[in-house]
């Protein structure tokens, strides 16, 4: 055991399903069969800046609803892992990256959001499948370029209260982000 402890560094159990390893918390809680809390909370910026990006129990419930109702059905349909580039962001992390503290990524007010893609799946086709098959509060096809299937990513939010079913497309026009209704 001594050799393993030296190899791993110091660690302790942090309660629920968190493991604290050398000062970093690993959220190994499974929210669904294929989606973990760690996937939705990891942030290189938070790690670099020493920001505690661990959600509260209420925020975890919102993330779990997103995972159950949006992320897992996508994972099951495509039978491929999702690459989640941004999930939960604590308010301090939002400020650090220049995002709104009212973003659904904060997972407050019974809603949560994630940005993701699936390698090898056209992001526009993925957005269409989600739009046609799942209930979401807001979906955004972000920075997709026609003719470049792996460009951009998908943003989806889910509310445990009520979902608007709003779909937008985000594009950069003259250096500014422009959001338009996405109807195609």
Where are these regions (language model features)?
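Aromatic (phenylalanine/tyrosine) cluster motif
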Residues: 11-13
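Extended, low-complexity, intrinsically disordered C-terminal regulatory tails
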Residues: 69-99
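Catalytic cores and adjacent binding grooves of peptidoglycan-active enzymes
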Residues: 17, 27, 104, 108-112, ...
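Extracytoplasmic cell-surface/polysaccharide-interacting catalytic and binding patches
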Residues: 19, 24-77, 160, 172-184
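Amphipathic alpha-helical interface surfaces
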Residues: 59, 66-70, 93, 112, ...
